[in-house]
Amino acid sequence: MAESIKQFTKKFGLPRLIITAFFMLLCVTAVLMGLPFGSMVSDVIRRFGMFGVLVLAMVPAIQSGIGPNFALPLGVLCGLFGGILSMELGFGGGMGFWSSIIISLPFAIVVGWGYGIMLNKIKGSEMLVATYMGFSATAFMCIMWVALPFKHPEMVWPIGKGLRVTVSLDSTFGQILNDFAAFKIGHIKIPTGLLIFFLGSCLVVWLFTRSKMGIAMRAVGDNPKFATASGMNVDNSRIIGTILSTVIGAIGIIVYAQSFGFYQLYMAPQYMAFGAVAAILIGGASARKAKISHVILGVFLFQGMLTVALPVANGLIPEGNLSEVLRVIVQNGIILYALTQVGGGE
C-alpha cells in the first residue's frame, strides 16, 4: 500500500498533488462560507484564458534546453511596446488588437535572437542570467517610457511628456476577446473568444513541436551531446526556442492586457515570469521537460487557487493580507522545489 502511494505521488508529482488538494479544500470552504461561487468560477475561467498564453511561452524555452524562461519580461516589454505604438498610430477595436501583435513581432524576434546568442555563451547559468536580464530590461524601459516621443492624449501625462503608469484600453480593444461570442450558464460567464485564442495558441505550439524543426529542438533540449553527435546544430535550436518564447510572451501580454482593460508600464513586467514559471511547474513540468498539457493544467490550478483563495482568506481573516502571502509562498515555493529537482554536474 505504501509503495503504491509512493509510486502515485512520484507519477502525479508532489507539487501538483498538494496544490490540487489545497484547491479542492478552498472550493469546499468557499461553498460552506456561502460565497458567490458562480462569480468565482467565472473569474477562474477568465484568468485561465488571459494568463495561459504567458505560461505557454515557457514550453519552447524548456524544450530547447534553456530551462524556464525567467527573462519573460523581454517578450512582455516587446508586446507592451507594440501595443503602445498601435495606440499611437490610432488603431482600435479588432484592428488595434491584431496590429499590436503584428507590430510587436519584429521587436520580439530581434530581441529573442540577441538574447539567444547571449544564452549560448553562458550555458549552464541560463536561469540566473535570465532573471537579471529581465530585471535590467524592465529598468531600461522605465527610462524609455519617459523619453520616447509619444503624443497620444490617453497615454501621456498631462504635462505632455512621458507615458502614464497605467494606460487604459477602453477606447481601443479592451475586453475584445473576452466579449467575443461570450455567453452565460447561470451565473457563470464563458469568455469564448479568450478561450479559443488560448487553446488555438496551444494547438499551434503543439503542431510546431511535432514538426521537423520542433523535434530537432526537443532533441537538443533532451540530450545536447547526442544531438551534436547526430549532426544537429545545438546553438541554432536554442536560439529558435528563445525566439519562440519571446514572441509568445509578447503576444501573451497583449492578451493579458485586453482582458484586464489596461497596460501597466514601468516596473509592472518585472515579476511576470515568476507566476508563469510556477504555473507550468505546478502542471507537472520540470526545468527540462514541458508539454502543452502541463500548461493547461498548471494555469487552471495556479490561477484557480489564487482566485478562490482571495475571498476565502478575506472571509476567514478580514484584517490581514493572507491571500497575497499565500500567492508568494506558493509561487516561490514551487519554483524552489523545481530547482532542487534539477540534476547537476553534466
Show the residue positions of the predicted features:
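Cytosolic-side transmembrane-helix boundaries in multi-pass membrane proteins
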Residues: 1-26, 222-229, 233-236, 298, ...
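Alpha-helical transmembrane segments within multi-pass membrane transporters and channels
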Residues: 92-138, 302
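Transmembrane alpha-helical segments in multi-pass inner-membrane proteins
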Residues: 249-251, 259-328
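Central hydrophobic cores of alpha-helical transmembrane segments
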Residues: 75-79, 130-136, 293-305
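Membrane-interfacial amphipathic/re-entrant helices at transmembrane-helix boundaries
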Residues: 1-56, 93-95
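Helix-loop-helix "hairpin" substructures at the membrane interface of multi-pass membrane proteins
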Residues: 187-264
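Single transmembrane alpha-helix segments in multi-pass membrane proteins
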Residues: 27, 38-91, 113, 118-124, ...
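Transmembrane helix-bundle core of multi-pass membrane transporters
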Residues: 137-209, 318-323
